[in-house]
Amino acid sequence: MIKFALALTLCLAGASLSLAQHNPQWWGNRNTIVHLFEWKWSDIAEECETFLAPRGFAGVQVSPVNENIISAGRPWWERYQPISYKLTTRSGNEEEFADMVRRCNDVGIRIYVDVLLNHMSGDFDGVAVGTAGTEAEPSKKSFPGVPYTAQDFHPSCEITDWNNRFQVQECELVGLKDLNQHSDYVRSKLIEFLDHLIELGVAGFRVDAAKHMAAEDLEYIYGSLSNLNIEHGFPHNARPFIFQEVIDHGHETVSREEYNQLGAVTEFRFSEEIGKAFRGNNALKWLQSWGTDWGFLNSEQALTFVDNHDNQRDQGSVLNYKSPKQYKMATAFHLAYPYGISRVMSSFAFDDHDTPPPQDAQENIISPEFDEDGACVNGWICEHRWRQIYAMVGFKNAVRDTELTGWWDNGDNQISFCRGNKGFLAVNNNLYDLSQELNTCLPAGEYCDVISGSLIDGACTGKSVTVNEYGYGYIHIGSDDFDGVLALHVNAKV
């Protein structure tokens, strides 16, 4: 009986711990993460203070913080080839990183670090030099900056069969030297690295290539981490938020269900299906059942996105900034529909898969510059600064904890729905106008459409909709309008 009670206690403690790792530790009603891909730490700090906090963003996913290999031309993916765990990259050094985390936390913006626990750098001719000046010999699995030697890695092999668990989790992903996370020493170095970031005030981690590591090894690592730092405004005993990259199309041996109890999981099916719908390959009317009925994870386990830094570069159904009208409609739906832990993308312009972030002649990442409307102009796309997207972050905050009600569709690609009595969204992806009296579920009054304009000093700079005493309003979205979506909420009442 005593053994049973002890086992039950340990089981419940483990369940409680994993549940806590699904909590993003947001401030107030904020509930959207933005991925400021390849931004410098000093620029993120300023963005937190001047743009993200005033517009209600909840957190920032940042690029990998550890020292990486220097590759010719400086492609973005060099950040995913670690040399050591020193906090020096093209985004800045440890002092600048710590300053950024502190300043963002001070204004209620949480920081989530993209971390590389699966591997170190791939092969390199001769001695490689990292962004902190550390030397390594990846071909010999020698990384003295940690230090790691060949005994800390799995034997080299290639992944040729994605249904072979051994290959997926112990062979080398695209030639990257595969760490042995079952080793006590490797575990200790990974935990030390993550704990240092927690000490500096981060709120959690995006775990790159999680499916390439055994779930039981990750469970041990996550469970060994320190609680979040109360000096950065986190409550006592708060656990780091974990979201894991697991690409699961439903037909491979290693599945997302092995990881979703340890933390949230990136729901790639969401990205693929929302792209198909707004590209016109699936009628929007079917989105009424969006979520688990589509084979997605439970809402609290799913990290959702229209595109990410990887799949936006691939051919296929995934939308990106190069299809702006459809991308804005998809993002509006993403942020309005009550499903998932939402993340929006902030990209830089690219012509091919390897395009580096905007940089100067010395290959230093340059800071974003803005026009008079606040949009980025020097190679940075900054989707998060598009009014149609940051306005929907405000919409999502305004309707938090409300249910989806009042669904309407025309049997095809025109839809609308309410979020309780606090918000209303309408979308037109047909080649003809949407012009109809629709139930907005809102209290009577005049509302500013936050997609086409902003509410400034009590006046709307875009479309406005008058809602009658029954909650109905006349909605018009022309097929040729600049935006194919309209959004109203209680905080945008004129």
Swiss-Prot record:
Its cofactor is Ca(2+); chloride. It catalyses: Endohydrolysis of (1->4)-alpha-D-glucosidic linkages in polysaccharides containing three or more (1->4)-alpha-linked D-glucose units. It is an enzyme of class 3 (hydrolase). Pfam families: Alpha-amylase, Alpha-amylase_C. GO terms for biological process: carbohydrate metabolic process. GO terms for molecular function: alpha-amylase activity; metal ion binding. Disulfide bonds join C48-C104, C157-C171, C376-C382, C418-C441, C448-C460. InterPro entries: A-amylase/branching_C (IPR006048), A-amylase_C (IPR031319), Alpha_amylase (IPR006046), Glyco_hydro_13_cat_dom (IPR006047), Glyco_hydro_b (IPR013780), Glycoside_hydrolase_SF (IPR017853). The modification Pyrrolidone carboxylic acid is found at Q21. Chloride binds at R206, N308, R343. SUPFAM superfamilies: (Trans)glycosidases, Glycosyl hydrolase domain. Binds 1 Ca(2+) ion per subunit. The record marks D310 as: Transition state stabilizer. Its main location: secreted. GO terms for cellular component: extracellular region. Residues 1-20 form the signal peptide. The keyword Transmembrane does not apply. The keyword Nucleotide-binding does not apply. The active site is at D208 (nucleophile), E245 (proton donor). Its EC number is 3.2.1.1. PANTHER family: ALPHA-AMYLASE. This is Alpha-amylase-related protein. The gene is Amyrel.
